[in-house]
Every structure is written in C-alpha cells, then in structure tokens.
C-alpha cells in the first residue's frame, strides 16, 4: 500500500478552499444573461465552447491532490443539482463557494464547525419553506416559454420551441433534443404511439411512391410468439375479410411460409393485412406489447396468460383510427382502448419510474409513458458550425430540463431575486448558541451571491444593485440583459422553484460537510525513476 500524506485543520481547509475557488471561478463566469463562454480543450477534434456550468465543472481536474479534492466535492454540487433539477448548476456552485469562504473564516476565528453547520441547516430548511410559499404554478404556454428562454441564456426561439413542443405532446410527453441538418431550429412531433419496427415485407406497402402502408380503422392483433403456421390465424383472417377492414399483426416474428401466405392474400385483395415485428427485447418487449394492447383495446395473446393464437377470434382484436407503417417505424394513432385502462397503465409506469435504479431503465420507462400519454416531440437544433451546434444543444437541453422543473414545482422571480426575498424568513430565527446564530447569518449573506455574480458578469456594481433590490418588495429586481429594474415576472425573468431549491439545498449540504472537515488524506506521488543510460551503439565505444 502506498504511503499517504495527511493534512490537518487550517492547512487542510485552506488547500480545499483553493481547489473550490479554482473550479467555482471558472464556472461562475457563465452566470446570467451577460455571462461569458468557457473554452474546453478536447483530446481530439475542435475545442468545445460552452456556457453550461456543469459541462465546465466536469472538465476540471487539478494537479495538487488536496486542491483537487475540494474541486471534486463542489463538482458534486453541480452534477447533483443537474441530476435533480436539470439546471441551476452555476447557481449551486456560486452558493457553495460563498458559504464555504465565509464558513472557513468563522472556523479559523475559533467558532465550532458543528454548530455552524447546524445553524446553516436550520436556515436552509426555513429558506426552502419560504421559496415554496413564494412559488407560483407554471402551466400556461407563456410562462413555459419564458422559463425556457431564460434558461437558454435569453434565447427566445428556444423558449418558443419548448413551449410549442409541450403544447403538442403534453407535459408528460417525451421531448428529445437532436442535432439538426440545417441552420434553422425545427420541431418534429410524432402523434400517437410510434415504435421502431417496420413492415416484414415491402409487398405490404399500400403507397408504392413513398413505400408506406396506411391502414384506416384497422383491427390489431398482438401476439408475443412467432407465427409459423397460417392455420393458427385462419379464424381471425376470415372474420377480418368478412368485415372489409384491414388487419395489423404485431408478433415476435412471422416465418416465411405464413408471411408468404399473408403477402399473397394482401396482393389479391382477399384481406388487407400488414405484419410487423414486436418492438423491444425480453421482458421489455412484453411490457411494450401490453402497452399497445391497452392503447388499442386488444387482448394481449400470450401463452404466459393462458392464451393460444389458434383460440383467438374477433373479440380479442383491438382497433385504432389510423395506422401508418414504413420500413423502419410503425405509428398507431388514436387507439380505441378504454380511458380508464390507459390511465391505470400510466400510473403503473409512473410507479416503476419512481422505483427505477438505473438511468437507462428510467429513460426507457419515460419513453413508454410518453407513447401512452401523448406522443414524442423532437427538437432539431440548427447551427452554422459544429462548435456552435454543440453549445446550442447543451443550452436547449438545460432549458428543457428547467421547463419540466417549472411545470413540476412552479416558478419564482428569477435573476437571484427569489433568494433575496426569502431572506425575510430568517428574521427572528435563532439557534441554540452564538455559533449557530453565526451559521444562520452566514447563509443569509451567502444567498446574495448569485445576484452579485449576475451583476458582476454584466459589468455592474453588485453592492449597489443588491441594496436597491433589498430596498424594494415583491418581484422587483434587476434585469442584467438591459440594465433596468422592474417586476421580474412581468419582464419574463423566471426561475423554476425546483432549480432554486435544489441549488440551495445541495450547496448548503456540501458546504456544511467541508466546514466540518478536520483532516485530508492523499497518496504521496512516488518520484519517477531516472531513465537508464543508453547502451553503446554496435561497433562504437559506449557514450560517456
């Protein structure tokens, strides 16, 4: 085991603070409408230019191991806030730095670190209550657009795109962000349920020009096994043929003989049919087939449920107003499933999302939820250069997460104003001793830091602005974009309550841990051995 170096008390905390300051100073320049860009070097390809706080934080590794420990702990604040709220990473970093700087001064002056932490925790709980009280619901398209605009660094086109996407697929719908092909931003919306499996034979195509199959008001058969014998399908095919309607078959697979029979019957016009493979794999496939069955009102034909294909009849088929099948995708629009059954299925998926352990599982469940509850919207980001594309995609992603957070927990006045207004909740709050009272006072001062940083980045005098905002009430604040004061909500400068709350809680939590640190342990780097002396060249004397 390698030898370790141990630092204690003030020396350890000073090193840790140096690391925190290095990381926070790089991150906080991005805050606010006049925040600056940070250029990140990449081991291959062009450097990345970004205004996304968490992207900057993730790139920073310091040479000094003790300073690096401090930087990594604050990096945790940024990434945790991003995970929970999707935005607010820079605000969280600024708050953590402000709290830690003042907290370590207090410890150096002889105050008890544990009491300081208790005071900070007590004040944080009170501030969170006040933020929730200040919060207003965010449900109308205008508020959603404003939140998206602010989070995308005052880019109104991004705010409008997100508001349009939410209006079309609902607040539960899946909205994804992709790199577009052109210079303009685009919004593509897929209504109904779409899955990535196309027809099993191009001979099912009804539109030969663009090779699609359009089925109006079709019956839908959903099976979780391979169909190899056409006899198993005869009762269903006869019933569908008599009705004069089309049939969509979704099965694990349809083997060659059965597929050939279906194709021939389709081409002769005996029965209009299209067969597609079931989406997904394993247990996820069964779950998705059950989703489709619920959406269309079909009975899921599965031997696990004691249902055999040969026993299937017309009663077991579902319907939809329209189905479109291409070589790659199948879209079911306006399924005829019962609203109650669909709502019940949605609640089951929501419960599974809450219990999911991995991001992958959670993402797949979210996709299933969206397909059942509304649809999928894809925002395609356009830009002139690849560097601009990456930077813009990061901003749109942030804005999307912030908007979802706003819909979930509501909105407060932006630009750091909500934290200033929440200060009044600390009036009269006292701890059990003077050191706890100092912890409360520390947080009262630290929550001014985001507003101060926004003003500094805009080239203003932070103390003047903070005093002006404090002297007024309600949503009155400072608009750094055009250097004016006024009602932040009316000016469309809003922050999601969840983002502000998460930033505050994570910053206070990490600062409390770092203030109470008394020792740091790191490995001692072994000096690399000197290079061996080169041997003499053949036929020549050795070099001296």
From Swiss-Prot:
Compartments, as annotated in UniProt: Cytoplasm
GO biological process: protein refolding
Entry GO CC: cytoplasm
NADP is among the record's keywords: no
Annotated binding of ATP, by residue: 30-33, 51, 87-91, 415, 479-481, 495
The entry's keywords: ATP-binding, Chaperone, Cytoplasm, Isomerase, Nucleotide-binding
Catalytic activity: ATP + H2O + a folded polypeptide = ADP + phosphate + an unfolded polypeptide
Enzyme category, top tier: isomerase
InterPro entries in the record: Chaperonin_Cpn60_CS, Cpn60/GroEL, Cpn60/GroEL/TCP-1, GroEL-like_apical_dom_sf, GROEL-like_equatorial_sf, TCP-1-like_intermed_sf
EC number: 5.6.1.7
Isomerase found in the keyword field: yes
Gene Ontology terms for molecular function: ATP binding; ATP-dependent protein folding chaperone; isomerase activity; unfolded protein binding
Family named by the database record: Belongs to the chaperonin (HSP60) family.
NCBIfam families attached to this UniProt entry: GroEL, PRK00013.1, PRK12849.1, PRK12850.1, PRK12851.1
Quaternary structure and partners: Forms a cylinder of 14 subunits composed of two heptameric rings stacked back-to-back. Interacts with the co-chaperonin GroES.
Stated role: Together with its co-chaperonin GroES, plays an essential role in assisting protein folding. The GroEL-GroES system forms a nano-cage that allows encapsulation of the non-native substrate proteins and provides a physical environment optimized to promote and accelerate protein folding.
Protein name, entry field: Chaperonin GroEL
Source organism per UniProt: Francisella tularensis subsp. novicida (strain U112)
Upper taxonomic lineage: Bacteria, Pseudomonadati, Pseudomonadota, Gammaproteobacteria, Thiotrichales
Gene from which the chain derives: groEL
């Amino acid at each position: 085991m390698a030898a370790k170096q141990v630092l204690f008390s003030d020396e350890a905390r000073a090193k840790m603070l140096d690391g925190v300051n290095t990381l926070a100073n790089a991150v906080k320049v991005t805050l606010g409408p006049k925040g600056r860009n940070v250029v990140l070097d990449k081991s291959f390809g062009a450097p990345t230019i970004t205004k996304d706080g968490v992207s900057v934080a993730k790139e920073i590794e310091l040479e000094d191991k003790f300073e690096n420990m401090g930087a990594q702990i604050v990096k945790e604040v940024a990434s945790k806030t991003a995970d929970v709220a999707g935005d607010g990473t820079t605000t969280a970093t600024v708050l953590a730095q402000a709290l830690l700087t003042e907290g370590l001064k207090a410890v150096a002056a002889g105050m008890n670190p544990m009491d300081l932490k208790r005071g900070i925790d007590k004040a944080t709980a009170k501030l969170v209550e006040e933020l929730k009280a200040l919060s207003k619901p965010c449900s109308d398209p205008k508020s959603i657009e404003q939140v998206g605009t602010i989070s995308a660094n005052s880019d109104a086109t991004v705010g409008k795109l997100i508001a349009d996407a939410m209006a079309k697929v609902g607040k539960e719908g899946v909205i994804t962000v992709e790199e577009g092909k052109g210079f303009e931003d685009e919004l593509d919306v897929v209504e109904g349920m779409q899955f990535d499996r196309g027809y099993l034979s191009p001979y099912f195509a009804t539109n030969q020009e663009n090779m699609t199959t359009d089925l109006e008001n079709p019956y839908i058969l959903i099976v979780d096994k391979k169909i190899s014998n056409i006899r198993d399908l005869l009762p269903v095919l006869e019933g569908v043929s008599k009705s004069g309607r089309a049939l969509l078959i979704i099965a694990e697979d349809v083997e060659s003989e059965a597929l050939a029979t279906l194709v021939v019957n389709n081409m002769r016009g005996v029965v209009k049919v299209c067969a597609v493979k079931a989406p997904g794999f394993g247990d996820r496939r069964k779950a998705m087939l059950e989703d489709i069955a619920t959406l269309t009102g079909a009975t899921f034909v599965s031997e696990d449920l004691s249902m055999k294909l040969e026993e299937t009849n017309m009663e077991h088929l579902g319907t939809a107003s329209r189905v479109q099948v291409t070589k790659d995708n199948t879209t079911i629009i306006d399924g005829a499933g019962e609203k109650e059954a669909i709502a019940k299925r949605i609640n089951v998926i929501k419960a599974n999302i809450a219990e999911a352990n991995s991001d992958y599982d959670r993402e797949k469940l979210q996709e299933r939820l969206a397909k059942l509850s509304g649809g999928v919207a894809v925002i395609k980001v356009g830009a002139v250069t690849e560097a601009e594309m990456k930077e813009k995609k990061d901003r749109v992603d942030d804005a999307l997460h912030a908007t979802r957070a706003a819909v979930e927990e509501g909105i407060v006045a932006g630009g750091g104003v909500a934290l200033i207004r929440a200060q009044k909740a600390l009036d009269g709050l006292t701890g059990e001793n003077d050191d706890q009272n100092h912890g409360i006072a520390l947080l009262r001062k630290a929550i001014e830091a985001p507003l101060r940083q926004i003003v500094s980045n805009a080239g203003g005098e932070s103390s003047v602005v903070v005093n002006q905002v404090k002297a007024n009430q309600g949503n009155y604040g400072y608009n750094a974009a055009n250097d004016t004061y006024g009602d932040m909500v009316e000016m469309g400068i809003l922050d999601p309550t969840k983002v502000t709350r998460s930033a505050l809680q994570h910053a206070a939590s990490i600062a409390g841990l770092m203030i109470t640190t008394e020792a740091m342990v790191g490995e001692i780097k072994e000096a690399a051995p000197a290079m061996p002396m080169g041997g003499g060249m053949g036929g020549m004397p050795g070099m001296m």
